[in-house]
């Protein structure tokens, strides 16, 4: 399996096993995000500012990267610090920041279910930008596999879970909100297209940057998360009055921050040693984890749409990574 296919060529079984374990952990952390957020709710809402959670997550990632360099887990490059190579990561941080904030604004122009279904278009935008920017061609089988991933995400978002006793499927916990009719405004559609493009561009650009630079991953992450902390600190400070930085935080909230920070570090390894396509499969597979945890922790029921989505994800993985 090649790097473009998401594998790591030339590795022995122990390192390949660690790579597989890393992908499984990342999948679990992605899937646990929405259920953990739901456990943070007080009186039906998140008791802390979302910008606080994002800022603390970026700060945690930055501290972990700095610690790994200080204790020598990853060697510092010889010679003076390559600060000039830090500048390109400012664009990565800006793209990720824009992407995270667009998610919030999109909710104003469409209902949660429409967002959950149509946001799967970012799989297609990532694949197109992956081919154009990194000059990798996808086979017909691989293209079909990504289409199946999009269909699986849309299927799950449309009704993979339901409240016990309710015969109508409901959106997953991440999209749970007060009932409202399906709708999307013209501006919402434009913003959604922009969101999908930025999502794909941020992923592909970061992958290209990390692979071209011959720097330790921890140092590259140090650059990226330094800009991320500065950007999110500015957004948090400019967000107006509201709860303090740590106000409303609980043990569950701390677990959300820690899991997202660790998952961000795992994803950076995927971007450097794997590919943006690998990341898409991790995110898609996390839907299964999300559904199972929602059923166990939040007492939601799995529907036929969940099992159909799981089947589509399995078929997509078989098509993309199977023998060709």
Curated annotation (Swiss-Prot):
<keyword id="KW-0813">Transport</keyword>
<feature type="topological domain" description="Cytoplasmic">
    <location>
        <begin position="1"/>
        <end position="18"/>
    </location>
</feature>
<feature type="transmembrane region" description="Helical">
    <location>
        <begin position="276"/>
        <end position="298"/>
    </location>
</feature>
<feature type="topological domain" description="Cytoplasmic">
    <location>
        <begin position="299"/>
        <end position="324"/>
    </location>
</feature>
<feature type="topological domain" description="Cytoplasmic">
    <location>
        <begin position="74"/>
        <end position="85"/>
    </location>
</feature>
<feature type="transmembrane region" description="Helical">
    <location>
        <begin position="251"/>
        <end position="271"/>
    </location>
</feature>
<dbReference type="GO" id="GO:0015165">
    <property type="term" value="F:pyrimidine nucleotide-sugar transmembrane transporter activity"/>
</dbReference>
<feature type="topological domain" description="Cytoplasmic">
    <location>
        <begin position="236"/>
        <end position="250"/>
    </location>
</feature>
<keyword id="KW-1133">Transmembrane helix</keyword>
<dbReference type="GO" id="GO:0005794">
    <property type="term" value="C:Golgi apparatus"/>
</dbReference>
<dbReference type="GO" id="GO:0055085">
    <property type="term" value="P:transmembrane transport"/>
</dbReference>
<dbReference type="InterPro" id="IPR007271">
    <property type="entry name" value="Nuc_sug_transpt"/>
</dbReference>
<keyword id="KW-0812">Transmembrane</keyword>
<protein>
    <recommendedName>
        <fullName>Probable UDP-sugar transporter protein SLC35A4</fullName>
    </recommendedName>
</protein>
<dbReference type="GO" id="GO:0000139">
    <property type="term" value="C:Golgi membrane"/>
</dbReference>
<feature type="transmembrane region" description="Helical">
    <location>
        <begin position="181"/>
        <end position="201"/>
    </location>
</feature>
<feature type="topological domain" description="Lumenal">
    <location>
        <begin position="272"/>
        <end position="275"/>
    </location>
</feature>
<dbReference type="Pfam" id="PF04142">
    <property type="entry name" value="Nuc_sug_transp"/>
</dbReference>
<feature type="transmembrane region" description="Helical">
    <location>
        <begin position="19"/>
        <end position="39"/>
    </location>
</feature>
<feature type="transmembrane region" description="Helical">
    <location>
        <begin position="215"/>
        <end position="235"/>
    </location>
</feature>
<keyword id="KW-0762">Sugar transport</keyword>
<feature type="transmembrane region" description="Helical">
    <location>
        <begin position="86"/>
        <end position="106"/>
    </location>
</feature>
<feature type="topological domain" description="Cytoplasmic">
    <location>
        <begin position="164"/>
        <end position="180"/>
    </location>
</feature>
<keyword id="KW-0333">Golgi apparatus</keyword>
<feature type="topological domain" description="Lumenal">
    <location>
        <begin position="202"/>
        <end position="214"/>
    </location>
</feature>
<feature type="transmembrane region" description="Helical">
    <location>
        <begin position="143"/>
        <end position="163"/>
    </location>
</feature>
<comment type="subunit">
    <text>Found in a complex with SLC35A2 and SLC35A3.</text>
</comment>
<keyword id="KW-0472">Membrane</keyword>
<comment type="similarity">
    <text>Belongs to the nucleotide-sugar transporter family. SLC35A subfamily.</text>
</comment>
<dbReference type="GO" id="GO:0022857">
    <property type="term" value="F:transmembrane transporter activity"/>
</dbReference>
<feature type="topological domain" description="Lumenal">
    <location>
        <begin position="40"/>
        <end position="52"/>
    </location>
</feature>
<feature type="transmembrane region" description="Helical">
    <location>
        <begin position="53"/>
        <end position="73"/>
    </location>
</feature>
<feature type="topological domain" description="Lumenal">
    <location>
        <begin position="107"/>
        <end position="142"/>
    </location>
</feature>
<comment type="function">
    <text>Mediates the transport of CDP-ribitol. Does not exhibit CMP-sialic acid, UDP-galactose and UDP-N-acetylglucosamine transport activity.</text>
</comment>
């Amino acid at each position: 399996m090649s790097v473009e296919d998401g594998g790591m060529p030339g590795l022995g079984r122990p390192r390949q096993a660690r790579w597989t374990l890393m992908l499984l952990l990342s999948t679990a952390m992605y899937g646990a995000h929405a259920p953990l957020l739901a456990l943070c709710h007080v009186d039906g809402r998140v008791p802390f500012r979302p910008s606080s959670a994002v800022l603390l997550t970026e700060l945690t990632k930055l501290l972990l990267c700095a610690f790994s360099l200080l204790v020598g887990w990853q060697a510092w490059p010889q010679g003076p610090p390559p600060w000039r190579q830090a500048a390109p990561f400012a664009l990565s941080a800006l793209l990720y920041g824009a992407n995270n904030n667009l998610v919030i604004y999109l909710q104003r122009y469409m209902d949660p279910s429409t967002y959950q279904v149509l946001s799967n278009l970012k799989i297609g935008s990532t694949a197109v930008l992956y081919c154009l920017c990194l000059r990798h061609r996808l086979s017909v089988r691989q293209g079909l596999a990504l289409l199946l991933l999009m269909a699986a995400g849309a299927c799950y978002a449309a009704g993979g879970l339901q409240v016990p006793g309710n015969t109508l499927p409901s959106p997953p916990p991440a999209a749970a909100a007060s009932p409202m009719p399906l709708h999307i405004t013209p501006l919402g559609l434009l913003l959604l297209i922009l969101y999908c493009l930025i999502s794909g561009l941020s992923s592909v650009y970061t992958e290209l940057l990390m692979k071209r630079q011959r720097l330790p991953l921890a140092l590259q992450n140090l650059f990226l998360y330094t800009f991320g902390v500065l950007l999110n600190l500015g957004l948090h400070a400019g967000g107006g009055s509201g709860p303090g930085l740590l106000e409303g935080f609980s043990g569950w909230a701390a677990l959300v921050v820690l899991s997202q920070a660790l998952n961000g570090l795992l994803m950076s390894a995927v971007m450097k040693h794997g590919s943006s396509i690998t990341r898409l499969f991790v995110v898609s597979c996390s839907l299964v984890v999300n559904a199972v945890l929602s059923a166990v922790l939040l007492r939601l029921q799995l529907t036929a749409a969940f099992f159909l989505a799981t089947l589509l994800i399995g078929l997509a993985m078989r098509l993309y990574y199977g023998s060709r």
